[in-house]
Design a protein with these regions (language model features):
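A well-structured
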Residues: 1-313, 598-600
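Long, K/E/R/D-enriched contiguous segments that form extended
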Residues: 295-339, 398, 445, 451-457, ...
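C-terminal, non-catalytic "cap/extension" segments appended to globular domains
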Residues: 10-14, 21, 25, 113, ...
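Short pre-active-site segment immediately N-terminal to the catalytic Zn-binding motif
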Residues: 316-318, 368-390
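Post-HExxH zinc-binding segment in Zn-dependent metallohydrolases
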Residues: 413-442, 450-452, 456, 530
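Catalytic zinc-binding patch centered on the HExxH motif and its immediate surroundings
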Residues: 316-318, 351-371
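Active-site recognition of the HExxH zinc-binding catalytic motif
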Residues: 252, 380-400, 422, 427, ...
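Conserved helix-loop functional segments at active or binding sites
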Residues: 329, 333-340, 366, 395, ...
Length: 600
């Protein structure tokens, strides 16, 4: 099988699908777990009003919570994976809905935890630690809760907010169902008149084509279709930011951004400093755009020209087997213990590889490491898909290490560090590929791909982050997120980030309609900060070898045992300063010079 043929789910060869029996042997076993989980709310209720009574009671509560968290994580993971493998399957959509409803019910049942732990006097808590040494395992979780005391409400209010959690998922669910299951696009033709099937999954690969006619036709057809439903897309985004504002206001935060970042202990200035630092380096992006126009030899550079490789015909078809082999070679620098787990993941079907009809687009790794994470791909047998593979396996290895070496309550790393391991893998792969070739054409192609990573990860994700910040401010001021308002703001940002050399086609004003991460609550900025951190970490690994790898494994195994900025500081990267972003973009400038010299 290859990435060109899109089959119904039932016809995809088993070896290219994930084996969810590692979580539950069958759907029936999952349903048995559904019934078993219904017993927990009563057990949890027995602790209400009692967490401050004794050290033993508090320890017993945390032990029960760990048990529930592991079981619910596996329960939701199974249903979500089943749903995402074919979002048009109503049975698994129902299973997913039941999973989230159950998780919300259990979260609501334990909603008294935060306020009760907040109410324990400092001297009483100190006595608890002395009386019950096992509570030390939970000190970090307790400290995180008590740090947010000003934003925790009464038990009654916390229960209401917890119950509202399922409603808050509606914008994302609506977008996902509409965009992935219901949207259909017209076929498009290339320069030879051959017909191509346009889907959300084939859209970007078409924009990478050397056939400019195909690129333009796909670009215009995709956004024409999106434009027909622009008000639906705007409505879901409006609902998303209204619910973020509701929760931010309820918890007495100054903004939706502050509310989002406070949970993960990331200072707001890290977000705004990123935008400022990238603004200060836009000249390098403009140089890149000018170089791309020159090399492509076009009179006008359009938005449908930004994905196609600059070096014509340098890309080669890379099968999934080849991609796995190269990934193992590139990541061997991280040690045999690291690659042994990768090989286990490949051989034991932790991955769902190819696109099928109705499958969720894009790629992701599940955040649950019990028994192990799963990875969804839509592999296309090209270089970009190989980078996606190592990216998602970076997530998988981060999750695997944290769940293996951390107790349950500190195993889940926060999103601020979530993209570091994945991006570090990409950079190690790029360095590996560049180190294998002296061919000027191939080297130029790889450097251009590296430059595109800077463009797509550091610049583009910062542009998304700035757009997300603007949407948050609109919602906070009471302004509706209408199609016209969103498109005007997005087009203005596109012009700012790409500069005057790029033609910002009218269609690109609707790109916000296709970005699922806008429903992830200020997530995308971390791609940019993580890329900057990953550049520094990969350089250290390649420069120092074993000592750096040892520190890196500690980072991977750190979960949320420390504040995320501190975990990175232990690797020598201080994201509270603009230095990592500026250093990464200095490398971007150097790569532009090298590519220019190679291509003359």
């Amino acid at each position: 099988m290859d990435g060109k043929t899109i089959l119904p789910r039932s016809e995809v060869p088993e070896e290219f699908t994930w084996d969810l029996s590692h979580v539950f042997a069958s759907d029936d076993k999952w349903n048995e777990e559904l019934e078993a989980l219904k017993a927990y709310p009563e057990r949890m209720a027995a602790y209400a009003g009692k967490l401050g009574e004794s050290a033993k009671t508090l320890l017993d509560w945390f032990t029960l919570s760990d048990e529930i968290n592991v079981r619910v994580s596996k329960f939701v993971q199974y249903a979500s994976c089943r749903s995402d493998q074919d979002v048009g399957n109503s049975f698994y959509q129902g299973m997913r809905s039941k999973a989230f409803s159950t998780a919300v019910a259990l979260n609501s049942a334990g909603s008294f935890e935060a306020s009760e732990i907040m109410a324990i006097p400092d001297e009483t808590l100190a006595r608890f630690y002395a009386e019950e040494p096992k509570l030390e395992t939970y000190r970090r979780s307790i400290d995180k809760l008590r740090r947010r005391k000003a934003h925790i409400l009464s038990p009654e209010c916390e229960k209401i907010l917890a119950a509202a959690g399922e409603i808050s998922e509606s914008p994302d669910r609506t977008f996902s169902m509409f965009h992935n299951a219901d949207m259909r696009y017209p076929d498009v033709t290339d320069a030879k008149g051959e017909v191509h099937t346009l889907t959300d999954g084939t859209f970007v690969p078409m924009l990478m084509s050397a056939d400019r006619t195909l690129r333009e036709n796909a670009f215009k057809a995709y956004y024409k279709r999106a434009g027909e439903f622009r008000n639906t897309y705007a409505s879901t985004l409006d609902a998303q930011f209204k619910q973020l504002k509701f929760f931010a206001d309820a918890r007495r935060y100054n903004s939706t951004l502050e509310a989002s970042l406070d949970v993960t202990e990331v200072p707001v200035e890290v977000y705004t400093n990123l935008i400022d630092a990238v603004h200060g380096n836009l000249d390098k992006m403009y140089r890149y755009v000018e170089l791309r126009k020159k090399i492509l030899g076009v009179d006008e550079l359009h938005m449908y020209d930004v994905y196609t490789p600059i070096v014509a015909d340098a890309d080669v078809e890379i099968s999934f087997e080849e991609a796995k082999k190269t990934a193992l070679e590139a990541l061997a620098v991280l040690g045999k213990d690291y690659t042994d787990v990768l090989e286990e993941a490949f051989s034991n079907r932790w991955l769902d590889v190819y696109e099928n009809t109705g499958k969720r687009g894009g790629a992701y790794c599940t955040g649950n490491g019990w028994p192990h994470p799963y990875v969804l791909l839509n592999h296309k047998d090209n270089l970009d898909s190989m980078f996606t593979l190592v990216h998602e396996m970076g997530h998988a290895m981060h999750t695997w290490h944290s769940c293996k070496y951390q107790p349950v309550n500190t195993a889940e790393y926060v999103i601020f560090v979530a993209e570091v391991a994945s991006t570090c893998n990409e950079i190690l792969l790029m360095r590996h590929l560049l180190g294998k070739t002296d061919d000027r054409k191939q080297r130029a192609y790889l450097i251009n791909h590296f430059l595109d990573q800077f463009k797509g990860t550091l610049y583009r994700q910062t542009m998304f982050a700035e757009f997300e910040l603007q949407m948050g401010k609109m919602a906070e001021s009471g302004e509706a997120l209408t199609t016209d308002a969103l498109s005007a703001k997005y087009l203005a940002l596109n012009k700012l980030y790409f500069g005057d050399t790029m033609i910002s086609d009218d269609e690109i004003a609707l790109e916000w309609t296709r970005i699922p991460h806008f429903y992830y609550n200020y997530y995308v900025f971390q791609y940019a900060t993580s890329f900057s951190a990953a550049v520094a970490i990969a350089n250290r690994i390649l420069r120092e070898g074993e000592s750096a790898v040892k520190d890196y494994k500690k980072f991977l195994s750190g979960g949320c045992s420390k504040e995320p900025v501190e975990l990175l500081r232990d690797m020598g990267v201080d994201m509270r300063t603009p230095a990592p972003v500026n250093d990464a973009l200095s490398l971007f400038g150097e790569l532009i010079d090298e590519l220019s010299a190679l291509l003359g």
